Curated annotation (Swiss-Prot):
Assigned keywords, A-Z: Disulfide bond, Endoplasmic reticulum, Glycoprotein, Immunoglobulin domain, Membrane, Repeat, Signal, Transmembrane, Transmembrane helix
One Gene Ontology molecular-function label: TAP complex binding
Protein name per Swiss-Prot or TrEMBL: Tapasin
Organism: Gallus gallus (Chicken)
Site (May be involved in interaction with TAP): R413
Stretches assigned to the Lumenal side: 16-399
């Protein structure tokens, strides 16, 4: 087996993602409004373009919930879904799904690892009739189904799901270096299959992993990419999740999980966003300045991703009050360009040169404030300016001393009556 691939045959791997138990089927999901494209697609869930017509997908009969408001459908598809892959679309809280439907010609892949599915280079006899690809999704769930059509009345088409590829993680966020699972599974009649995981980013694409179930081998496996292969469960669903051991900024982008069967193939798409919060250091750590001299503050922001970061300076005069812009006490400031490290993260430095120190500047607090998309709130690192040769308590020191004195006074008053009470009682008895 190719290096870098671990096949984890975990029958329970899919249990956290599986659809409702077939013994107690849930009510059918609400009908889904769809855009029916006129052009014939290229197969596998790729739209073929052309004009769009309003259509409606119905699942398993009449649903209790009416469809979302919209134009009157010109075509209604009554879809039979034996594996329940479309059921999660109606589970509350329900987000109106997006849906695109286009006719297609069933076909297998042209990659070398998918050719053994059709050694005679001919489509199977079951590939006759009309075929469509339905791509339906919400922020929490995405499914692409290959539909085989049957007879129907005017304006109505009866279709059955022949293959469905789904994901419970259509959009993911991963920290640099932290393992991440890109969930994918498929439902289909028992047969040999070929799996392909492809990564696309900034116009470039690569096959991360390919797996052939007939040989249980991976003809293609990129280092760091692992296949979590689940066994077929009672609902006919097989998990084919991709695990990235140490994602880096270069792993950000679009991931395509494609499943090839003898009668055709389809795929689902996932988006991975990589992030890393910045580390912030401020120098010097101790800011002691002689009267009449200036100092320079440097704020170093490192190890962050993505690129955009904002660095600002703030000052609290005398260490009290609210933070304000230090423009009255800063002569000059500058910010370096971005520098990229070997792991793909970025760093940059901001500096501020202060005006010559005066007695009234003693105790000023300067802060470097960093804002970044990976931070829940801005990060602040501060330093206090101390004027050499200047003594005397600051407001914070006075407040602290007052609190200590208050506590000590209360403690003495609590202890003193206990010690003095016997003497007072003796005097009264005399």
């Amino acid at each position: 087996m190719a290096a870098g691939l671990r096949l984890l045959l975990a029958g329970l791997c899919w249990s956290q993602f599986r659809v409702e138990d077939a013994a107690s089927p849930p009510p059918p999901p609400a009908p889904v409004r769809c855009a029916l494209l006129e052009g014939v697609g290229r197969g596998g869930g790729l739209p073929g373009g052309g004009n769009a017509r309003p259509a409606l997908l119905r699942f398993g009969g009449d649903a209790e919930t009416p469809p979302e408001p919209g134009p009157e459908p010109e075509v209604t598809f009554n879809v039979s879904d034996p594996w329940g892959t479309l059921t999660p679309l109606g589970v509350p809280p329900r987000t109106p799904p997006s849906c695109e439907l286009n006719p297609t010609n069933p076909q297998t892949g042209s990659d070398p690892w998918s050719r053994p599915l059709h050694p005679d280079a001919r489509s199977p006899p079951t590939a006759g009739g009309q075929w469509w690809v339905a791509a339906v999704g919400t922020p929490q769930y995405g499914v692409t189904a290959l539909l085989q059509g049957g007879m129907g009345t005017e304006g109505t088409i009866t279709a059955a799901v022949a293959l469905a590829v789904l994901t419970h993680t259509p959009t993911l966020r991963a920290r640099v270096g932290s393992p991440i699972h890109l969930h994918c599974a498929f439902a289909a009649p028992p047969s040999s299959f070929v799996l392909e995981w492809r990564h696309q980013n900034r116009g470039a694409g690569r096959v991360l992993l390919a797996y052939d179930s007939s040989t249980a081998r991976a003809p293609r496996a990129h280092p760091g990419a692992e296949l979590l292969l689940g066994t077929r469960d009672g609902d006919g669903v097989t998990a084919v999740t991709l695990r990235l051991a140490r994602p880096s900024p270069g792993d950000e982008g679009t991931y395509i999980c494609s499943v090839f069967l003898p009668h055709g193939h389809t795929q689902t798409v996932l988006q991975l966003h990589v992030f890393e919060p910045p580390k912030v250091t401020l120098s010097p750590k101790n800011l002691v300045v002689a009267p009449g001299t200036s100092a320079e503050l440097r704020c170093h922001v490192s190890g962050f991703y993505p690129l955009d970061v904002t660095v600002t300076w703030q000052r609290r005069a005398g260490g009290s009050g609210t933070s304000q812009s230090p423009r009255d006490t800063v002569m000059d400031s500058w910010t370096s360009g971005h520098r990229q490290a070997a792991d793909g993260t970025y760093s940059r430095t901001a500096a501020a040169r202060l005006i010559p120190a005066r007695p009234q500047h003693h105790g000023d607090i300067y802060s470097c404030v960093v804002t970044h998309t990976a931070l829940a709130k801005p990060m602040r690192v501060s330093v206090r300016l101390l004027l050499a040769g200047t003594e005397g308590p600051h407001l914070e020191d006075i407040t602290g001393l007052f609190l200590v004195a208050f506590v000590l006074c209360g403690l003495i008053r609590w202890l003193y009556p206990k010690a003095a009470r016997p003497k007072e009682e003796t005097k009264k008895s005399q």
